[in-house]
């Protein structure tokens, strides 16, 4: 993107407050135009002093002019600050909502730390651009447009010096931008690397402590920051050199104006006040040119940050639901997978030609070796991923034609990793249904056999669970997740190895709750417990993304196929296939 394209797209975010922004910008433009009168007034004061005429009226006018400028500037700056801060807050909220609504496949590909860093850096960059646009950008441009004609009206010869100075500034800026474009992009990449390393290390701090990696990770971060600085310093050097060149050009221009002005005054072609006024114009022009240089530098530095953010925003908008997506309602729970194919990029993993039907209220157990595609199948049902071909239907409705909100309202999921937020136990359970009363939360916790450990805490349901639930044991986290699903009361239930973190005693207590929860609900279980597989109406055995065997538990054990071999390998089935297997876990 060009600098102009980056700038105009950044300003489009202000259109939601277009009238307020317009008032602020127009006020700043008027102030910039009025400011041009200041050198003229000062020149008239010098002329009055040198000629011995009454200077008081002009002094009063100048003082009043200064007071008005100050008060007006404060009022305009205050409104600009409020607008910029407010828009930044709403942008963060809006962008966060769009990003977090993206499917997990997008987050896995993009990376959580990358998306977070891009959002935070972009919001700060946009804030700076908006603030400077309302305060100085347009006002600077207007002042430059008005300064030159006004100066030319006073004296054409001195005006050419100012025009030459402006051209020099432009060439220096263009030259330095060409020299630093790649370097600035490299700087932004290094910032992403630093942020990703910090985020990755902090989120896995327990592993780092366990393997005594603190010093090593700190050294690694130092290496990342050194690479960042090695990329940053050349860019800073070029802009420092540009600043020195601009300052030299400004000083030389002032000297030329003074020399020419002195000659013209001696020849009687100009008054001293005119020269003083022109020096004021030169100072104004230099100040505005410096602002313009800073503005261009700001846009230049912003481009690398904002281009990535705009790509992120475009990707999010491309994934937005079509306007004609309908609501999935009155779900009974019949689920059909019809010739489903899906593959992950650059791998052979996925699912291939999967077809089966789960009638309303049935329980489907999905078993198979690691990497067989069990979780992928469930993720397709929840539209974490969309299939490459085929259809998934709920009550005969293709789920690709319904809103994701209505689809997910129809499905309650208990993940292998409970996935708790750093909030209270009550808030985590209430994620299942935001409108649930405290009594309903307690009832759901009781059904999940969670009340004992909750009541044992000093703060009970107000206990903070910590980041990702790290203040609770694995079994405690899982029971909260089960309570959450119970509270949601959805017609379709997904249990992704939901009791894997529970001990035998706790599992026995939870099983009754899960069995009650499964009644009159279509349930999909990534199975790891024998009792769960035995109770299923349909068992799917997956291997390398394909359904190898399908049927009831008894049918598959009598068939003597891959499912039977898995049971025997796990020690769950003897050579006598009719013998009752021992209650152990199935490898998955």
Swiss-Prot record:
Domain ABC transporter spans what residues? 335-569
Binding-site residues, ATP: 368-375
Q: Name one GO molecular function term.
A: ATP binding
Is Cytoplasm tagged as a keyword? no
Enzyme Commission code = 7.5.2.3
Q: What is its main location?
A: membrane
Question: Where found, per UniProt?
Answer: Cell inner membrane
Mind telling me which SUPFAM superfamilies this protein's record contains?
ABC transporter transmembrane region (SSF90123), P-loop containing nucleoside triphosphate hydrolases (SSF52540)
Stored Pfam families: ABC_membrane, ABC_tran
Calcium keyword on record: no
- State the membrane topology: Multi-pass membrane protein
The reaction(s) catalysed by this protein are: [(1->2)-beta-D-glucosyl](n)(in) + ATP + H2O = [(1->2)-beta-D-glucosyl](n)(out) + ADP + phosphate + H(+)
Enzyme type, top EC level: translocase
Note the InterPro entries from the entry. AAA+_ATPase, ABC1_TM_dom, ABC1_TM_sf, ABC_transporter-like_ATP-bd, ABC_transporter-like_CS, NdvA, P-loop_NTPase, Type_1_exporter
Query: In what residue span(s) does the ABC transmembrane type-1 domain sit?
Result: 21-301
**Keywords on record:** ATP-binding, Cell inner membrane, Cell membrane, Membrane, Nucleotide-binding, Sugar transport, Translocase, Transmembrane, Transmembrane helix, Transport
What job does this protein perform?
Involved in beta-(1-->2)glucan export which is required for crown gall tumor formation. Transmembrane domains (TMD) form a pore in the inner membrane and the ATP-binding domain (NBD) is responsible for energy generation.
Quaternary structure and interacting proteins, as annotated: Homodimer.
Free-text note regarding domains: In NdvA the ATP-binding domain (NBD) and the transmembrane domain (TMD) are fused.
> What family classification does the UniProt entry report for this protein?
Belongs to the ABC transporter superfamily. Beta-(1-->2)glucan exporter (TC 3.A.1.108.1) family.
Can you name this protein?
A: Beta-(1-->2)glucan export ATP-binding/permease protein NdvA
